[in-house]
Amino acid sequence: MIVDFKELRIPLIHPTYPPYHTGKYMEEYFYEFYLNNKKEFDQTGFTLIPIFWTNVYIMEGKGANKRRLIQPYLNALPQGKYFTVSQHDDAVAEQLPEGTLSFEGGGNGKGIPLPLICSKMPTKPTINKKDIFCSFVGSASHPIRDTIRETYINDSDFQLYMKPWTHAIPDAQLNFFIDITNRSKFSLSPRGYGAQSFRFYEILQLNSIPVIVYDKKWFPFEDEIDYESFSVLIHADEICNLKNILNNISDKQQKDMLKRGKDLIGMYKYTK
């Protein structure tokens, strides 16, 4: 069997998500980067499995009927050293060749964590004085988010706006998220369907302190990055203590965390 992964690099015909994103998605961008730097990659001894996982997974529900090809193609690969890159929450669900390095942005798999990123937000923070202690604007897409709402919905220090998840996000809703986040000292970044959220990197861009609420530890490059220097890490079991934890962070600490967050923003991008 000739393995032609071109069949698994299909275009994505789907509402843009997040709505401000422009250009390629992670797998598409990395494939181009790989081709442009193939000599350097070849020196590592590893070969890319060039599947646009996100496109194939999403388009399966739109009648593309390509996902059925993935496992036979993987099974037909000659023995060797491989790696792959994926963004979709559920990738990679198929059985990869033994020893394959799977770099994953979604967080529902068991691979090597990658940041879940896209292009920059089309706005810069304009508010320096924060009039909101802690906020969340987003979808009710995981029990952790439900628990946060149930715990703090009646607390005036929290502004929580949750709705059912939808593919399309109107401009008014995006602008509301930007405004509320920019005005917040702390902005909640609880996991949704996937272990990661675009929200974490959006919060950094909007000059707020991310509060990562997690049940599964999924922190990309944690051997290189001190997450607690610019964000607050809250396990799901600690949601009831979340406010006390935030209240114990001094104004000086908050200022230092915001500065550190700004310093790190440049690491979380793959488009200009």
Positions of predicted regions on the chain:
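Nucleotide-sugar donor-binding catalytic core of glycosyltransferases
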Residues: M1-Y201, Q205-L206, I212-I234, C240, ...
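C-terminal helix of von Willebrand factor
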Residues: N244-I245
